[in-house]
Amino acid sequence: MPSLNEIRSTFLNFFGGHGHEIVDSSPLVPRNDPTLMFTNAGMVQFKNVFTGLEHRDYNRATTSQKCVRAGGKHNDLDNVGYTARHHTFFEMLGNFSFGDYFKEDAIPFAWDLITKEFGIDKSRLLVTVYHTDDEAAEIWKKHAGLSDDRIIRIPTNDNFWMMGPTGPCGPCTEIFYDHGDHIWGGPPGSPEEDGDRFIEIWNLVFMQFEQFEDGTREPLPKPSIDTGMGLERIGALLQGSHDNYDTDLFKTLIEASAHATSVDPYGDKNVHHRVIADHLRSTSFLIADGVMPSNEGRGYVLRRIMRRAMRHAHLLGAQDPVMYRLVPALVGQMGQAFPELGRAQALIEETLMLEETRFRQTLDRGLKLLDEAVADVPEGGALPGETAFKLYDTYGFPLDLTQDALREKGRAVETEGFDAAMADQKAKARAAWAGSGETADESIWFDLAETHGATEFLGYDTEVAEGQVLALVKDGAQVAQLAEGETGWMVLNQTPFYAESGGQVGDSGGYLKSNGSGAIHDTQKRNGLFAHKVTPKAQPLKAGDVLEMRVDPARRTAIRANHSATHLLHEALRQALGAHVAQRGSLNAADRLRFDFSHSKALTLEELQKVEAEVNAYIRQNSPVETRIMTPDAARDLGAQALFGEKYGDEVRVVSMGRQSGSGKGVSGETYSLELCGGTHVKQTGDIGVFVTVGETASSSGVRRIEALTGEDAFAYLSAQDYRLAEVAASLKAQAADVPERVRSLLDERKALQNEVAQLRRELAMAGGGQGTAAPEAEAVAGVPFLAQSLSGVSGRDLPSLIDEHKARLGSGAILLIADTGGKAAVAAGVTADLTDRLSAVDLVKAAVAELGGKGGGGRPDMAQGGGKDASKADAAIAAAKAVIGG
């Protein structure tokens, strides 16, 4: 009996032996189809190949595609665990032809594989065809030898596939297996077709037409093939069961769940183990493909799946987290076929444990409330919607989890009341928004967020991705289109463009579409939406357009380097200055970075050099930059740095870089820098290139600011500095290495000359030389010796020392000196100690300054200084001082 792994290999090798390229599964988050929440079919990754928008090096392919159906119209969540074939995660085996072969080869390929390679009894097989597809029916007769009664013609769209209202389409043929009359059910097309006797195992789609808007169809020049066969279904059949949960893979997971909970795997609690086994697969693969639990979008679907599994673990009596303990069993079963599962194992386990721990804190209280409420609801009745909403709003119970719990009790949920309570909450939120002071222009973003939900950000993994235009905004109002050359704002369902936040500027770039293009100037965050400032260049831009979004790669690279450098800078400052250093703000632009941090004084040159050297040391280390998702508390317990004043949600992204011995902080190893951050970063620290500080200043009280450059900008700055140094060296007629000593020597020489000049000025002033108009000898004013001089060629700094020299010469008296400093006046007055009890130098200065066009003046009774605007009024100033003495 072949295992599922062997069946997968047989399928892929069969088609590989028939010239098909064996292509790896694409991620569960589709990159080329923004209309899909998750990849749900094998053809998703080939959509653009089928439509001619993409060319590959092969024209036939085969895959085993990871698929999830748990959101949107493809939502199997409620049935999972209770039926034989519903899953949230499954593998779709498929073979594809892109204009190479068609029906005459596709049907024989399928028949030969299932009857010869898999050895399925031909007598158990029957097929359906579209009622007008005589060609397919004839091939089945000719190659498989099927009689007319085993070729069922279906007139409905069940056997006609369409990619959309327009575009490629064509008939299908499906292969069914008859499990026998001991199982209830009828053949396809019969009233009993929903039974389990006849099970579809393979669907072959013949893309042979193109449908136009008027409903007409024309043959495609190169018809193509798209087939899909569920691995779990064919596996159950080949292992002798009609229940997918009886296959070897699910048995392993169910038994692991039973071991972890100490509950019989196949007793009356079996359904709980089945739910856990299925949900373990979908949650693990979603996390491995980059989806993290959240309250919106794909993350919310993941959280719903996780919490549903966790409730079933609770029903098995589990008191501690269970699901993370089952991951090794899953990796053992599927890790070889999907290596990404093993690579992400630690992240999967940690995410599951954190989510289950957090949810368990509210699960008991929520279930108690539910039990109390159900006591008042008769069997077959419905729980009031308001109660279900309280469970959702207060305890984080998704509606489908409550419905799932009630189904086991024979009750339902009154969904109209739930919807009404949800609408009421939104109305209150809208009223709060309206009263918050936001402008009418800004309130449009609340409406759009309520309608469309948060934008899915893809930019951690790619700089190019498709997105569908959900809304266009111009002058604060929603518009249907933006004309060529008109600038407005654009919202998409998903985008690779980073919206400005956390100090990192928004991305810019452009977009392409089938018949046009445009420029994206900036990206801003508006109430959870990513708003792109856009100008169409060729053709108008319309709501509903599907765009290929392209981030400016050079600009993004520079921004990433600067952002990662701020993380290294933050830790280097903490190492150099102390643990008190904390981020107070930052700017991570393409051409520079700015980092504000708590510190009370300017950094010394030695401190700056130490910080710069340490940052560059970790750049040269070229260590990987890693990201993890965890709770804020868990991140802080690890020592992660958080932005001052920032509010964080239930999960945070933790960025780590650099390795050092003995730090003990690392998520994996001894991490140098560990920060909560939602921005984009380099993959290796070496990608930063080089780091150089260009300024250190005060930002505000107790906050310093460092400005710096990285990468090409840093190299350009260093090159310019080197050129300037060479110019200085040439001017000094010295080698570059000797410039500092040569400059110090010149400065010492200059200082000596300045001192000599100052001394000569003082001597000249004391001698009454120069252009002084007052006599150097004192005159008696009201019995007080008073010496006054108006001087030129003397600076204000020289006046106090001249005052002291005059005091020493006079012995007793008052002095007033006025220096002409380019038309303005510097004033100083002095009074000897024996006279300060009756005369103050401050009063003399104030009187003089008033005449010179100045204000104030101050100092001590024995020495005061001031200044005025007009030195030509020196005589009047001296007279005013005399009046003070004589007064």
UniProtKB/Swiss-Prot annotation:
EC number: 6.1.1.7
The organism's place on the tree of life at top rank: Bacteria
Segments crossing the lipid bilayer: none
Catalysis performed (reactions): tRNA(Ala) + L-alanine + ATP = L-alanyl-tRNA(Ala) + AMP + diphosphate
Residues reported to bind Zn(2+): 563, 567, 677, 681
Pfam families to which the protein is assigned, alphabetical: DHHA1, tRNA-synt_2c, tRNA_SAD
Co-factor: note: Binds 1 zinc ion per subunit.
Function, as annotated: Catalyzes the attachment of alanine to tRNA(Ala) in a two-step reaction: alanine is first activated by ATP to form Ala-AMP and then transferred to the acceptor end of tRNA(Ala). Also edits incorrectly charged Ser-tRNA(Ala) and Gly-tRNA(Ala) via its editing domain.
The family this protein is said to belong to: Belongs to the class-II aminoacyl-tRNA synthetase family.
The protein's name in its UniProt record: Alanine--tRNA ligase
Taxon lineage: Bacteria, Pseudomonadati, Pseudomonadota, Alphaproteobacteria, Rhodobacterales
